[in-house]
């Protein structure tokens, strides 16, 4: 670096600001005349004195902007001085430079004067110089050249020029006369530099609105600033414009970066969620088939709503819709006057600054990847807490997230980790603008610490995502709804009195023919639907059929081995069941044991119920040596056929880790490469296991625990899935089966469900097909289709007795219930039944005051027949479009893997229901 050489120069007197050269004024020694002088004479003499003497460049007040064509205009950026490494500008404005002047005057975008600064000596560095103006640092952006830009700048600067400043000096006052030897006037030095400013009178009392002068509203609004949306709707193809209320100042338009990827149902979902979080009432849509997402409707406010429950089926893109909503609220707001805006009136910040996303720990990595996929992490700051962090490091990271504004906007955290940092979140809860809860059905327990922690944060805008919000418990339903929109259903006591009691009574099998109770229950159900549909959105995955590859569903009924039949008989005899006292809760242990027998008799010996109630050592030894079963035989044949006949991967799902152990051993013996995910896998390893399976072509199989690992996973690397056993809750199986048929899948999918013929496996399948009625009614899948199925999720004594029955003389008990066809692969069309009318007639006849024993027995028989008919009808409705195939008569199962392996499986498969995909149908 070159250091300038020191030179001892003589002192240079300072010059006045605004003067191009140094001027020294000396007072004269002439005697002052005391006689008064006329004003005109003083003025004339003063002009002569100034013109004859040295030139004085008297600075004018910068705000006095006259229409001077030689004035140059610039745009500027300004900020307060800061020592930050990454500096940002806090505002925009203008600068003016008058002709023959070396001073820049700076103003903010509203025309307020910020300060002035001298031009740099080097004119080439004009736009690189950092000027000091008052308490701000200022830098020139560019010079305005276009007439329209200059006119706009003049208008902005003239807003603060309504009241011109008073003159700095008075030329009309009588001044004493001073003469020098040359007969010329000179002003005294003290008077020349004194500023006689006129101060406005300041009232002693504080002014209130009552003392203010009333200005007409029209004149106030005439100069009101205009605001514009972040995106120009005219430059976007098929834009998504959000609805608004009457107070909105600007439209909110979804960023086309995301909007162009959204499907029609996702566009509707984003608008629905936005309306709910903004507290807008639902619009009245006459024709739901018309796309209303391109128009902004002015809606009334709904003060009861500030949250939303998105209950779409798995695979409909709930994560993408949520990211779109988050990005929209971070960048935009309808109330532009409440945030900082650019000089052109575009909001610079959005409605939300900090957003908290809470999800299962297995989905944290997936959420961050989705943000990176759709937005790029350079656009939005996403913070996740590392699993290697200590508790203190986590707390510090959360504190920094909330207090540092511009680094991170989104915090993704697991439900369990939420408890450890709850104190930091609660201290700064006013900084959190929005809460997103993925897999929100985990909050259904009112006593949950996680739920109470989230409630204590008191975040107004809440979004819950779930594919299974409710099955059959209205208490859990109330807990979730009251968390989303507190108080909308009233207190729990009033909710129980008004809704739970009448609906539960109507669903009780003992009241199935009580017309009054059923009518009241139906009325309360409809009332609840009207309340909750304002903020609950539920769509099924049927709308994905036109976007995803075809999917073929195959239900295979597997013949049980003789050892399995023997195990069923021994267990049922040893249990000594008393069906008169038996309930579903008391028989859960026995049900689980029988399900294990369906998977493999070798699981019996380690079962707790078997050890405590049966303890047959001789039978146990014979079972433990028999690891095979009908389903295991079919499974291994399918796996071998998939490996040899295709280049596809496969996912095997079970509800029991012990069953996965057996399958894993068999796959190891067969030399099938695989990976596994269950409850024993640490959370930090799960994401890497899924990624490895999807990307590594050498991995053939994926063993998945339905309950421990089936939440939110994306396994599109596989195109075939085998559900080895069933769960009582149909949503568990549906969620597990949806792991492969979702966005990102490129191949046709095949879903296999294995069921042991005539055993408890098949009874569970039948219950699954009949269930979901309560969920469908309250979430809007179908309001009337399942109107009569309000009690189909309850067990009576006959149901339990049938549950423990083993049918060895049937090819499919399910097919026997619904159809009498020959199983030749035809799709059966069922005639409409008059079931509802028969049910109503039975109800009316059961309300008579007296009946004889003979009539009572007749009615009981009719009721039993009616129940069987109803059960058949519900199962039949769920199996619409399925082909009925008896392998003894038809060897085409619409799948090349099963067809090629049919010689091995012919004795192991007793029946099949097949719902072919589009490709299979075209090939036929």
UniProtKB/Swiss-Prot annotation:
It is found in: Nucleus. Residues 299-487 form the Helicase ATP-binding domain. One of its GO terms (cellular component) is nucleus. A motif (DEGH box) lies at residues 472-475. Belongs to the SNF2/RAD54 helicase family. Involved in the recombinational repair of double-strand breaks (DSB) in DNA during mitosis and meiosis. Has DNA dependent ATPase activity. Promotes D-loop (displacement loop) formation with RAD51 recombinase. Modifies the topology of double-stranded DNA during the D-loop reaction to facilitate the invasion of the homologous duplex molecule by the initiating single-stranded DNA substrate. Required for adaptation from G2/M checkpoint arrest induced by a double strand break, by participating in monitoring the extent of single-stranded DNA produced by resection of DNA ends. This is DNA repair and recombination protein RDH54. It comes from Saccharomyces cerevisiae (strain JAY291) (Baker's yeast).
């Amino acid at each position: 670096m070159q250091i300038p050489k020191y030179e001892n120069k003589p002192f240079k007197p300072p010059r006045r600001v605004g003067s191009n050269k140094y001027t020294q004024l000396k007072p004269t020694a002439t005697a002052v005349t005391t006689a008064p002088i006329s004003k005109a004479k003083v003025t004339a003499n003063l002009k002569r004195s100034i013109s004859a003497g040295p030139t004085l460049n008297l600075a004018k007040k910068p705000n006095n902007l006259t229409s001077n064509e030689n004035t140059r205009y610039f745009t500027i950026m300004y900020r307060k001085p800061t020592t930050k490494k990454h500096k940002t500008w806090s505002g925009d404005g203008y600068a003016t430079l008058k002709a023959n002047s070396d001073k820049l005057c700076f103003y903010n975008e509203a025309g307020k004067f910020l300060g002035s600064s001298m031009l740099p000596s080097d004119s080439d560095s004009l736009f690189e110089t950092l000027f000091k103006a008052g308490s701000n640092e200022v830098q020139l952006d560019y010079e305005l050249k276009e007439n329209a830009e200059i006119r706009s700048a003049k208008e902005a600067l003239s807003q603060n020029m309504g009241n011109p400043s008073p003159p700095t000096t008075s030329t009309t006052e009588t001044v004493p006369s001073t003469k020098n030897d040359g007969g010329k006037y000179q002003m005294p030095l003290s008077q020349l530099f004194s500023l006689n400013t006129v101060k406005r009178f300041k009232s002693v009392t504080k002014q209130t609105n009552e003392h203010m002068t009333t200005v007409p509203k029209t004149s106030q609004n005439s100069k009101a600033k205009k605001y514009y949306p972040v995106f120009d709707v005219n430059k976007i193809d098929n834009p998504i414009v959000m609805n608004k209320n009457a107070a909105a100042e600007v439209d909110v338009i979804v960023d086309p970066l995301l909007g162009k990827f959204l499907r029609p149902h996702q566009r509707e979902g984003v608008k629905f969620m936005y309306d709910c979080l903004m507290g807008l009432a639902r619009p009245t849509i006459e024709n739901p088939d018309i796309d209303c997402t391109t128009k902004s409707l002015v809606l009334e406010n709904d003060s009861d709503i500030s949250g939303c429950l998105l209950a779409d089926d798995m695979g409909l893109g709930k994560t993408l819709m949520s990211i779109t909503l988050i990005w929209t609220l971070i960048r935009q707001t309808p109330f532009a006057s409440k945030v900082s805006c650019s000089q052109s009136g575009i909001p610079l910040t959005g409605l939300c600054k900090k957003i908290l996303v809470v999800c299962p720990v297995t989905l944290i990595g997936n959420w961050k990847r989705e943000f990176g996929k759709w937005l790029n992490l350079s656009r939005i700051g996403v913070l996740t807490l590392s699993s290697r962090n200590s508790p203190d490091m986590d707390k510090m990271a959360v504190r920094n997230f909330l207090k540092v504004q511009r680094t991170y906007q989104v915090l993704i955290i697991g439900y369990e980790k939420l408890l450890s940092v709850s104190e930091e979140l609660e201290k700064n809860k006013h900084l959190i603008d929005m809460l997103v809860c993925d897999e929100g059905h985990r909050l259904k327990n009112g006593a949950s610490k996680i739920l109470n922690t989230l409630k204590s944060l008191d975040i107004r805008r809440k979004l819950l995502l779930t594919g299974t919000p409710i099955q059959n418990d209205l208490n859990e339903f109330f807990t979730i709804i009251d968390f989303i929109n507190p108080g909308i259903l009233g207190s729990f006591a009033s909710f129980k009195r008004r809704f739970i009691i009448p609906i539960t009574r109507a669903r009780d099998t003992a009241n199935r023919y009580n017309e009054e109770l059923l009518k009241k229950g139906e009325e309360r159900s409809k009332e609840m639907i009207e309340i909750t549909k304002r903020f609950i959105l539920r769509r099924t995955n049927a709308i994905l059929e036109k976007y995803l590859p075809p999917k073929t569903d195959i239900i295979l009924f597997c013949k049980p081995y003789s050892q399995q039949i023997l195990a069923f008989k021994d267990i049922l005899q040893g249990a000594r069941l008393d069906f008169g006292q038996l309930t579903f809760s008391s028989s859960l242990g026995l049900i689980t044991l029988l399900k294990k027998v369906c998977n493999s008799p070798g699981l019996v010996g380690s079962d707790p119920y078997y050890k405590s109630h049966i303890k047959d050592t001789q039978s146990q030894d014979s079972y433990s040596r028999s690891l095979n079963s009908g389903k295991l035989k079919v499974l291994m044949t399918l796996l071998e056929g998939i490996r040899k006949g295709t280049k596809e991967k496969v996912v095997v799902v079970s509800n029991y880790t012990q069953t996965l152990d057996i399958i894993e051993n068999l796959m190891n013996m067969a030399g099938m490469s695989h990976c596994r995910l269950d409850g024993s896998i640490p959370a930090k390893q799960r994401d890497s296991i899924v990624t490895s399976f999807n990307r590594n072509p050498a991995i053939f199989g994926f063993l998945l625990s339905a309950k421990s690992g089936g939440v939110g996973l994306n396994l599109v690397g596989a195109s075939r899935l085998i559900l080895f056993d069933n769960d009582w809750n149909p949503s568990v199986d549906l969620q597990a089966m949806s792991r492969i048929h979702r966005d990102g899948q490129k191949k046709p999918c095949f879903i296999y469900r294995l069921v042991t013929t005539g055993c408890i496996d098949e009874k569970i399948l039948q219950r699954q097909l009949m269930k979901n009625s309560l969920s469908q009614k309250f979430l809007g899948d179908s309001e009337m289709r399942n109107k009569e199925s309000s009690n189909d999720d309850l067990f009576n004594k006959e149901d339990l007795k049938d549950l423990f029955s083993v049918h060895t003389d049937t090819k499919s008990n399910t097919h026997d219930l619904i159809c009498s066809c020959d199983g030749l692969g035809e799709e059966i069309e069922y005639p409409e039944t008059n079931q509802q009318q028969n049910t109503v007639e039975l109800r009316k006849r059961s309300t008579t005051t007296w009946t004889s024993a003979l009539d009572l027995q007749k009615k009981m028989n009719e009721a039993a027949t009616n129940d069987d008919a109803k059960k058949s009808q519900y199962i039949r409705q769920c199996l619409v479009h399925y082909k009925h195939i008896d392998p003894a008569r038809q060897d085409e199962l619409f799948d090349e893997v099963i067809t090629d392996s049919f010689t091995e499986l012919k004795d192991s498969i007793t029946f099949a229901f097949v719902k072919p995909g589009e490709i299979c149908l075209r090939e036929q």
